[in-house]
């Protein structure tokens, strides 16, 4: 995961100090890209331990089209707690936009199902896109989508994915985002009869919060270790049929966890 450490170092050394919505303050750069070859291991950060359970359950929750944190709470995942209302609702966030984008004529568009179908029928299409950024509903969301749009690309029997992330919390959020979209790409590839290719991560405002500088410096002192391998149940051929038990991580040997406060 040298690419991730390079991003962190680049922002610390070359970023601009800015104010932000949370009042914490950031150091940020605008425009950056990382690439991960999914054939060379699963890109789960090794310079600090990550909670893979949260990453997998959040992705499954997105794919269900769910926007209430009950499923997450039932599975001991708390990453969305700060933004939910008293009933656990988040408004029309990722899952709703992915699976039930409202059209002007009253229809609801299942963007994920449509993309799976198009990858199978027309893999050379340049329209294999899912957007979570719906301007008409942004104000109703507890948190507007940070990872806003992603596109798939098929070449030489491999499926690749590029994510555009408008806002990226480098220390806390980005490691989760890398693993989540890498896993989604692998799942999509399997159900479409393809191999996983690359995950390309493109950023708009990539930032380190000021209260994460010490943690970032500590992480930069650590040597990356070999990437783990993600095993996915080969029997699952329906993207929406995956369960937590269908994933097994092998060979994950990270450095210890580093605590940091999330800015809400």
UniProtKB/Swiss-Prot annotation:
Its EC number is 2.1.1.45. It is an enzyme of class 2 (transferase). It is found in: Cytoplasm. GO terms for biological process: dTMP biosynthetic process; dTTP biosynthetic process; methylation. Pathway: Pyrimidine metabolism; dTTP biosynthesis. DUMP binds at residues 21, 126-127, 166-169, 177, 207-209. Keywords: Cytoplasm, Methyltransferase, Nucleotide biosynthesis, Transferase. (6R)-5,10-methylene-5,6,7,8-tetrahydrofolate binds at residues 51, 169, 263. It catalyses: dUMP + (6R)-5,10-methylene-5,6,7,8-tetrahydrofolate = 7,8-dihydrofolate + dTMP. Signal peptide: none annotated. The active site is at 146 (nucleophile). GO terms for cellular component: cytosol. Pfam families: Thymidylat_synt. GO terms for molecular function: thymidylate synthase activity. Homodimer. Catalyzes the reductive methylation of 2'-deoxyuridine-5'-monophosphate (dUMP) to 2'-deoxythymidine-5'-monophosphate (dTMP) while utilizing 5,10-methylenetetrahydrofolate (mTHF) as the methyl donor and reductant in the reaction, yielding dihydrofolate (DHF) as a by-product. This enzymatic reaction provides an intracellular de novo source of dTMP, an essential precursor for DNA biosynthesis. Belongs to the thymidylate synthase family. Bacterial-type ThyA subfamily. This is Thymidylate synthase. The lineage of its organism: Bacteria, Pseudomonadati, Pseudomonadota, Betaproteobacteria, Neisseriales.
